[in-house]
A protein has these predicted regions:
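Generic detector of well-ordered alpha-helical packing
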Residues: 48, 71, 89-92, 123, ...
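An extended, acidic
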Residues: 147-265
Length: 265
């Protein structure tokens, strides 16, 4: 049955990201070999070690699933699979390099392009966020819900200050508490557990940055869309997403009122 399959996949993901996360935890605070995949896009030997361990743990258990990971060559065979593992071995690599405890190990399963199981693990703070389709979201095994905040003014948003303060906005944003975290998956998870009310990113992202947080926020009662209010679909031939906004339902709509008609470059 799908529900049992989704829950089994969630349990597998939480086990895998915890075990692979131990590799990142052991290397945290050291100086791993580091290079740039592209300008401003660093990767470390630890990213690759975590990726290899996740690949072993997950595909040994689910050999029929597709695979999409930031640190693996993209295999187009994933496009033929109903269920696909989507992985970010270390989301927030720069924070990891700088010894900031704001990185996460992320894994999700999609079914026909929709997330059905997810786990986001911060091995330094020992926060395990998880969800399965229709079964709710949890932080360290305890159910979580998004905040019920409905007003932007006075709310808590994870967003780049230069975005919220950009002069091109037709309307100035009201006073809010603005925060930041290196890992976008971590930002989404913090919305899911109501530490923040919303998260907005208007820069291009990859599927592996977003997909686990998408399910966790939704299962915590929130909404996840692009800036135009459209749901996100995964396992696409080009796994890029133009923008993402997540929040509780009421404040999400208030954000969309400001973003729905903007033109992104």
């Amino acid at each position: 049955m799908p529900a049992a399959e989704d829950s089994a996949d969630r349990d597998l993901l939480t086990h895998a990201v915890r075990e692979a996360g131990a590799i990142a935890e052991a290397a945290f605070g050291t100086k791993p070999k580091t290079w740039e995949k592209s300008k401003g896009n660093p990767v470390t030997e630890t990213d690759l070690a975590v990726n290899a361990r996740l690949h072993e743990l997950l595909l040994d258990a689910r050999p029929g699933y597709g695979w999409l990971s930031e640190e693996s060559a993209d295999d187009p065979d994933r496009l033929t699979k109903a269920r696909v593992l989507v992985i970010d071995p270390i989301d927030g690599t720069l924070a990891f390099i700088k010894h900031k405890p704001e990185f996460t190990v992320c894994a999700a399963v999609t079914d026909h392009g929709r997330p059905v199981a997810a786990a986001i693990f911060n091995p330094i703070t020992d926060e395990m966020f998880s969800a399965a389709r229709g079964a709710g979201a949890a932080l360290n095994g305890k159910p979580i819900k998004v905040s019920a905040t409905s007003e932007l003014e006075g709310s808590r948003m994870l967003v780049a200050k230069d975005v919220i303060g950009h002069p091109a906005w037709p309307r100035q944003w009201p006073p809010m508490t603005v925060g930041s975290r290196a890992s976008i998956a971590y930002r989404m998870a913090l919305v899911a557990c109501a530490q923040f009310d919303s998260m907005m990113s208007l820069s291009s992202k990859h599927e592996w940055d977003i997909v686990a947080g998408d399910l966790i926020v939704r299962e915590a009662g929130g909404r996840v869309t692009n800036h135009a209010g459209k749901d996100l679909v995964y396992n696409q031939p080009v796994p890029h997403l133009r923008s993402v906004i997540c929040a509780g339902p009421a404040i999400h709509e208030a954000i969309l009122e400001r973003t729905r008609d903007i033109k992104l470059p």
